[in-house]
Amino acid sequence: MSLGVLAAGIAVLSGIGAGVGIGIAAGKAVEAVGRQPEASGRVMTFFILGAALCETTAIYGLVMAFMLMGR
């Protein structure tokens, strides 16, 4: 087995971190809206921004995995 395949598998694991991060952020956003429903628009704005930042780590991991497999 090539070390590139192993490295690509480890790089894809960044998707797990992104999923956990988005899950925690969504839970906290729902909790915040439950406490203050009038602030739901602002909470959702920050949630979407945070989710996008979490998702970039998964995208970078996927790109790195493709680059490592292309060697």
From Swiss-Prot:
Record's bilayer topology term: Multi-pass membrane protein
Pfam families associated with the record: ATP-synt_C
Highest taxon in the source lineage: Bacteria
Record InterPro entries: ATP_synth_csu_bac/chlpt (IPR005953), ATP_synth_F0_csu (IPR000454), ATP_synth_F0_csu_DDCD_BS (IPR020537), ATP_synth_F0_csu_sf (IPR038662), ATPase_proteolipid_c-like_dom (IPR002379), F/V-ATP_Csub_sf (IPR035921)
Predominant localisation class: membrane
Annotated site residues (Reversibly protonated during proton transport) in this chain: 55
Transmembrane feature ranges: 5-25, 46-66
Gene3D superfamilies, sorted: F1F0 ATP synthase subunit C
NCBIfam families: ATP_synt_c (TIGR01260)
Functional note: F(1)F(0) ATP synthase produces ATP from ADP in the presence of a proton or sodium gradient. F-type ATPases consist of two structural domains, F(1) containing the extramembraneous catalytic core and F(0) containing the membrane proton channel, linked together by a central stalk and a peripheral stalk. During catalysis, ATP synthesis in the catalytic domain of F(1) is coupled via a rotary mechanism of the central stalk subunits to proton translocation. Key component of the F(0) channel; it plays a direct role in translocation across the membrane. A homomeric c-ring of between 10-14 subunits forms the central stalk rotor element with the F(1) delta and epsilon subunits.
Family note: Belongs to the ATPase C chain family.
Protein name as it appears in the record: ATP synthase subunit c
Species: Clostridium beijerinckii (strain ATCC 51743 / NCIMB 8052)
Lineage: Bacteria, Bacillati, Bacillota, Clostridia, Eubacteriales
